[in-house]
């Protein structure tokens, strides 16, 4: 028994460990350190980071597709809606043009989520961002041609991508 006749405490071992965070949780510092590490380790590290970014883009789109009510029979317009909704979360503004053999998607990115890191690590940031978007597009459209037209790395106000989706 415990104090004053109350029942004593029963302590149990916690299944999950205790997490320490040093320094405080700061995603921008983690991003900065990761970019510095990729920069220092060179091309092989960048290629591995691009693979990770690409797979993350694919997995993100797989989750969005799975949550769609008709995920087994997605039409072009359904896929476009999924891509557009995903794109809007991070500042993409898509425009669609079509012809008889293919449809062209034009993405202009006016609000890069990583613009703070462009000063020191523009090449890395742009390549990782592009591979993420490429992963999302490849998950939705099997036959596509993905082309970067321009990006903020070259002092542009926005990034521009064209995606040709073949029927």
Model regions and ranges:
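Conserved segment of winged-helix/HTH DNA-binding domains
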Residues: 2-43
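A short beta-turn/loop motif at secondary-structure boundaries
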Residues: 2-5, 99-101, 151-155
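Broad gene-expression machinery/nucleic-acid interaction feature
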Residues: 8-10, 104, 158-160
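Beta-strand residues in well-ordered beta-sheet regions across diverse protein folds
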Residues: 12-14, 108-110, 162
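Short, charged/polar, Gly/Pro-enriched secondary-structure boundary elements
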Residues: 15-22, 114-118, 167
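Mid-protein regulatory/catalytic core that forms ligand/cofactor-binding pockets
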Residues: 36-148
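Coil-to-beta-strand transition motifs
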Residues: 141-144, 154-158
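C-terminal edge-of-domain segments
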Residues: 156-167
């Amino acid at each position: 028994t415990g104090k004053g006749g109350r029942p004593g405490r029963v302590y149990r071992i916690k299944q999950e460990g205790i997490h320490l965070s040093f320094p405080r949780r700061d995603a921008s510092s983690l991003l900065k350190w990761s970019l510095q590490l990729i920069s220092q380790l060179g091309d092989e590290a960048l290629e591995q980071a691009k693979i990770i970014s690409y797979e993350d883009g694919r997995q993100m789109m797989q989750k969005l597709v799975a949550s769609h009510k008709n995920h087994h029979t997605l039409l072009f317009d359904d896929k476009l809606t999924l891509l557009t909704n995903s794109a809007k979360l991070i500042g993409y503004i898509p425009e669609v043009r079509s012809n008889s053999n293919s449809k062209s998607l034009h993405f202009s990115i006016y609000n890069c989520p990583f613009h703070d890191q462009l000063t020191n690590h523009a090449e890395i940031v742009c390549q990782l961002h592009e591979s993420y978007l490429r992963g999302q597009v490849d998950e939705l459209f099997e036959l596509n041609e993905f082309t970067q037209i321009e990006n903020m790395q070259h002092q542009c106000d926005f990034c521009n991508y064209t995606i040709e989706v073949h029927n």
